[in-house]
Amino acid sequence: MSRIGRMPIAIPAGVTVEVAENNKVTVKGPNGTLDRVLPAEMDIKVEGDTVVVTRPNELKRMKSLHGLTRTLIANMVTGVTTGYQKVLEINGVGYRAAKNGKELTLTLGYSHPVVMKDPEGVETILEGQNKITVKGIDKEKVGQYAAEIRDKRRPEPYKGKGIKYSDEVIRRKVGKTGKK
């Protein structure tokens, strides 16, 4: 059996998990509600304060879906209890971010400012002009929006200018050597 898939998911106090037909899982918690349709082949059962995912047979596809389904439910439970966040840092002369309502305006050395709208269920918080925190209860949406912000100006290897994750390490390169 899948090692991740067979681990039961603990449901903390204050969180409810409901499984409707066609494996539509709804997780309600202190931070909000998440719902998602999971693969119909998997058997999802709520047993007391745990959720158990089982698979019908040993086909490779079923083994893959087993671990995936369990992890998606675990991420939903974590999201409604503690939430997710990603921290981005902006490096570079004149590079900065500004927030106006739900709009994030990035000045990244282009001839125009880059304006991004926060998606539903995700919020951005600015700490100073060069630190952006993306927060939300849906892990996928938080990661996707953080990646979209980073893609507006990826860090370059010579000076490290651009937008990077706070825990990301940029491999630096040595520039050209001048003539002697």
UniProtKB/Swiss-Prot annotation:
Part of the 50S ribosomal subunit. Gene3D superfamilies: Ribosomal protein L6, alpha-beta domain (3.90.930.12). This protein binds to the 23S rRNA, and is important in its secondary structure. It is located near the subunit interface in the base of the L7/L12 stalk, and near the tRNA binding site of the peptidyltransferase center. NCBIfam families: L6_bact. InterPro entries: Ribosomal_uL6-like (IPR000702), Ribosomal_uL6-like_a/b-dom_sf (IPR036789), Ribosomal_uL6_a/b-dom (IPR020040), Ribosomal_uL6_bac-type (IPR019906), Ribosomal_uL6_CS (IPR002358). One of its GO terms (biological process) is cytoplasmic translation. The keyword Nucleus does not apply. Keywords: Ribonucleoprotein, Ribosomal protein, RNA-binding, rRNA-binding. The keyword RNA-binding applies. Belongs to the universal ribosomal protein uL6 family. One of its GO terms (molecular function) is structural constituent of ribosome. This is Large ribosomal subunit protein uL6. The gene is rplF. It comes from the Bacteria.
